[in-house]
Amino acid sequence: MKVVAVTGYKPFELGIFKNDHPGVECIKKALRRKLTVFVEEGLEWVIISGQLGVELWAAEVVFEIQVEYPNLKLAVFTPFLEQEENWKEDNREYYEFILSQADHIDSITKRKYESPEQFKLKNQFFIEKSDALLAVYDEEKSGSPKYIVEAAKKKGEIENYHSYFILFSDLQDIMEEEQWNNAE
């Protein structure tokens, strides 16, 4: 596996409204564990669309992993131009920081937002250009990742394409592990 697409929930879908929320570190730890294993098995690129939440947190994790594995690269393929234009200023600054550190940036449709079709094109692009999908996603709470997860599963039925999931139960295990470690 050379290229993995990473996605997951937007912050509000998780009840997270600031990047210093304890849940963010928990999600990043889960992503770090999975991505480190993938890198040790030959992963070269992580691709994201730059969506707030899991995707940008994954970008931060990639930057951390790059210290030990400098050959790992991050690509941001936005579904449309200027996706951040209606975001709050602090979110825009955070997004621009991530873009400034990315190894590759491009827009899939090369135009500003016009219709939801651009999100469908983004999902198709990500599934076509990656060898696997890593999603912070639990079918019990579908949310925004639902459509790309469905596309990945469909591709997996006809080709050698894998989907890896970080479930709410995985995050709960990490939180309990942290509480246990902090109690010692």
Swiss-Prot record:
InterPro entries: YspA. Disulfide bonds: none annotated. Belongs to the UPF0398 family. HAMAP family: UPF0398. This is UPF0398 protein BcerKBAB4_1482. It comes from Bacillus mycoides (strain KBAB4).
